[in-house]
Amino acid sequence: MTNYAIILAAGKGTRMTSDLPKVLHKVSGLTMLEHVFRSVKAISPEKSVTVIGHKSEMVRAVLADQSAFVHQTEQLGTGHAVMMAETQLEGLEGHTLVIAGDTPLITGESLKSLIDFHVNHKNVATILTATAQDPFGYGRIVRNKDGEVIKIVEQKDANEYEQQLKEINTGTYVFDNKRLFEALKCITTNNAQGEYYLTDVVTIFRANKEKVGAYILRDFNESLGVNDRVALATAETVMRQRITQKHMVNGVTFQNPETVYIESDVEIAPDVLIEGNVTLKGRTHIGSGTVLTNGTYIVDSEIGDNCVVTNSMIESSVLAAGVTVGPYAHLRPGTTLDREVHIGNFVEVKGSHIGEKTKAGHLTYIGNAQVGSSVNVGAGTITVNYDGQNKYETVIGDHAFIGSNSTLIAPLEVGDHALTAAGSTISKTVPIDSIAIGRSRQVTKEGYAKRLAHHPSRSK
């Protein structure tokens, strides 16, 4: 039997106090809508329909061609939102999952189990439920003495007995697709909120003696719907714990897992050691045996095997095996470091390729450069790559030696095995095997220091 999915993503999210649509707020690097959509993929839907409304083009852009879209101009309740999908799904045979786009913690495994339960029990409708210690604000699941679901009652419509019930509606359902849209034609706004409740279709099915079931989540956290920043922070905490636990199970050591931030798409190989206060974001890959020390920040980068990154920032860069970086280094976008390169403290590299075993140990800026292998870049070296309008390239050959406090004015080429003298300003090509000296000759004036006002001899 075919599966379909309807994702409800039309709401503004007033309690978020934000210009951003609620479902576009991020949890561990992905929007809530993306988390939900990835989980929905577990049921292999033939067609997914996303109901959009507030700032619809922003929401549409997140899923693009992965989903069909329908527009809910007025937000008149969950039942009304699902009605909008009628043009896409009416009359089709199959099972339809309905899920809110603000439930980022729901897992694909739970949705697959929900569908299987629905099919195996031959239900017309199956509600995903959970047991809440504090059910206030949730719709309650009302069962008869035989344990059968007879209705769902919203908090504002619940009587005193119903408000004591602990089993809550998570807002996720599976329906027989045809019967869903037939029942939606019968619901009304005769309730405390004056809205079309999707939950009213359960009462309709029961009145027709059709089978309604409930599948109870094992982990209550999966039921969390995010309506404000407090819930968003809770979702972030739970997701972060899931992510670090997944990596630990896969062989990663965290010295202080509560303090690290790792986003959903980060990949980490076994035998990596991660100290506290490390941030890994975007599409980052960390190779086996690598050590990331306290305070390291890496985004959208590939770090090879057996690297050591000490308290440094790395953005959109590629590091081969055995590279060492830091402390206090900054690798900016477009940086590529070959095997066993060393980038030391207070070194910045941007848009450059550095060959294997090259070392830049201290206080250096390398920008828009092609640096060969086994080059020594002395402390205080600056590649002067920008003239106020354009940027130019510096090329340094293999085994070159760049003396401390060298200023290399691009465009410039320093040949293989060439040397620049310490303190030089180099603006012309340095041929292979040459030495370039670009500084004034030292002039020493013996005894002249005594003429200075601060000299001790002047105070007598």
UniProtKB/Swiss-Prot annotation:
Binding site for acetyl-CoA: 379, 385-386, 404, 422, 439
Gene Ontology cellular component list: cytoplasm; membrane
Residues the entry annotates as binding Mg(2+): 102, 227
Function: Catalyzes the last two sequential reactions in the de novo biosynthetic pathway for UDP-N-acetylglucosamine (UDP-GlcNAc). The C-terminal domain catalyzes the transfer of acetyl group from acetyl coenzyme A to glucosamine-1-phosphate (GlcN-1-P) to produce N-acetylglucosamine-1-phosphate (GlcNAc-1-P), which is converted into UDP-GlcNAc by the transfer of uridine 5-monophosphate (from uridine 5-triphosphate), a reaction catalyzed by the N-terminal domain.
Source organism per UniProt: Streptococcus pyogenes serotype M28 (strain MGAS6180)
Subunit structure of this chain's protein: Homotrimer.
Stored CDD domains: GT2_GlmU_N_bac, LbH_GlmU_C
Cofactor or coenzyme needed: Mg(2+)
Family: In the N-terminal section; belongs to the N-acetylglucosamine-1-phosphate uridyltransferase family. In the C-terminal section; belongs to the transferase hexapeptide repeat family.
Name of the featured protein: Bifunctional protein GlmU
Chain segments carrying region N-acetyltransferase: 251-460
Region (Linker): 230-250
Catalytic activity annotation: alpha-D-glucosamine 1-phosphate + acetyl-CoA = N-acetyl-alpha-D-glucosamine 1-phosphate + CoA + H(+); N-acetyl-alpha-D-glucosamine 1-phosphate + UTP + H(+) = UDP-N-acetyl-alpha-D-glucosamine + diphosphate
Cofactor remark from the record: Binds 1 Mg(2+) ion per subunit.
PANTHER family: BIFUNCTIONAL PROTEIN GLMU, NUCLEOTIDYL TRANSFERASE
Pathway: Nucleotide-sugar biosynthesis; UDP-N-acetyl-alpha-D-glucosamine biosynthesis; N-acetyl-alpha-D-glucosamine 1-phosphate from alpha-D-glucosamine 6-phosphate (route II): step 2/2; Nucleotide-sugar biosynthesis; UDP-N-acetyl-alpha-D-glucosamine biosynthesis; UDP-N-acetyl-alpha-D-glucosamine from N-acetyl-alpha-D-glucosamine 1-phosphate: step 1/1; Bacterial outer membrane biogenesis; LPS lipid A biosynthesis
Cell compartments where the protein resides: Cytoplasm
A molecular-function term among this protein's GO annotations: UDP-N-acetylglucosamine diphosphorylase activity
Enzyme class: transferase
Binding site for UDP-N-acetyl-alpha-D-glucosamine: 8-11, 22, 72, 77-78, 139, 154, 169, 227, 332, 350, 365, 376
Family matches, as HAMAP family: GlmU
